Regions:
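Structural beta-alpha unit
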Residues: 1, 41-44, 60-64, 76-114, ...
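General small-molecule cofactor/ligand-binding pocket signal
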Residues: 35-37, 90-94, 144, 189-191, ...
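Structured core of small recognition/catalytic domains
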Residues: 187-258, 273
Length: 299
């Protein structure tokens, strides 16, 4: 099985509905263990024991009655997914800073995948909120960011778009994309978009464009095609333009149901690099889930 242990990081709001559907669906298809994890309250400042509810913003006393109320509300919110899923699942609650608590629990149970979404997607210019951003940066496994309904994911993923800028971080993402495509018998599109914004002021004629494109294809052949190890269902696509625009075009043209990207594009250490702007723009506009991969041990 590709995923044996899935952690669904729920905000407890409607913003997590799409991630919930995918997490429960993947757990059912993969016969995986599933944990629904919700950080229900952020401790208030001062000497009070009250917490600020992460859904309503109200002050609450984090006693047994409050936690039982939260459990009932989560069971109601995800009643359809819970009823449809034949796999047992755990529901875990915590109090603290959401990103810190999610990462702490992830280190404890060692999931293969974290599914999450940004509850403020509809009103935030930046789709990747502080919690998702922090989790994606430090997570010990791939983080699947789901902000729109995935209509093709119920049968798992059949068309996977892997995007590379040839950084070390992209190598980690490639291993995850290849492993996923191999185990699910999916088509893998290895994609690179030449950033035209980095060559402004330069005029390239058609022969130069073709030569540059061929160089990128040769680089893909050396770095990635040579490591397919018998996997034959792969296609190389090289485009020129604004990277996130071209990535979304490739995904749309090939009916992708998963995009795999490195969490960051530069060769910074995993702990120093913030989520890349291209990833953020893809997440904002993608019609399918986006897997952010940070670390080499990602499966």
């Amino acid at each position: 099985m590709l995923f044996k242990n899935i952690l669904f990081a729920s905000s407890g709001t409607a913003g997590s509905d799409n991630a919930a559907k995918l997490a429960f669906g993947l757990a059912e298809k993969q016969q995986a263990e599933l944990t629904l994890y919700h950080c229900c309250g952020v401790p208030s400042r001062g000497f009070t024991t009250n917490v600020t509810d992460t859904r309503s913003g109200s002050l609450e006393q984090p006693d047994e009655a409050y936690q039982e109320m939260v459990r009932e509300e989560l069971n109601t919110a995800y009643a359809y997914q819970i009823e449809a899923c034949t796999r047992p699942f755990r529901m875990e609650l915590s109090v603290g800073m959401p990103s810190t608590e999610i990462l702490r629990y992830a280190r404890q149970i060692k999931p293969d995948l974290i599914a999450a979404s940004d509850p403020n997607a509809a009103r935030m210019r930046s789709i990747v909120g502080n919690t998702v951003r922090a989790v994606a940066k430090k997570a010990p496994c791939p983080v699947l960011i789901v902000n729109r309904p995935c209509t093709t994911c119920w049968h798992l993923f059949s068309n996977i778009v892997f995007c590379t800028d040839f950084s070390e971080a992209a190598n980690h993402a490639f291993r995850f994309a290849l492993n996923t495509a191999r185990q699910l018998n999916a088509k893998l599109y290895i994609t690179h978009a030449v950033d035209i914004t980095s060559i402004q002021g330069m005029t390239m004629d058609q022969s130069e464009i073709e030569r540059h494109t061929e160089q990128m294809r040769e680089k893909i052949d050396k770095l990635y095609l040579s490591k397919l190890d018998g996997f034959a269902n792969a296609e190389v696509i090289v485009r020129e333009g604004i990277p996130y625009v071209e990535i979304l075009k490739v995904a749309r043209e090939n009916e992708a149901d998963l995009i795999v990207m490195a969490h960051h594009s530069s060769d910074l250490s995993d702990d120093d690099a913030d989520i890349g702007s291209t990833v953020e723009q893809v997440v904002l506009r993608s019609a399918c889930p986006v897997a952010s991969v940070t670390r080499p041990e990602a499966r």
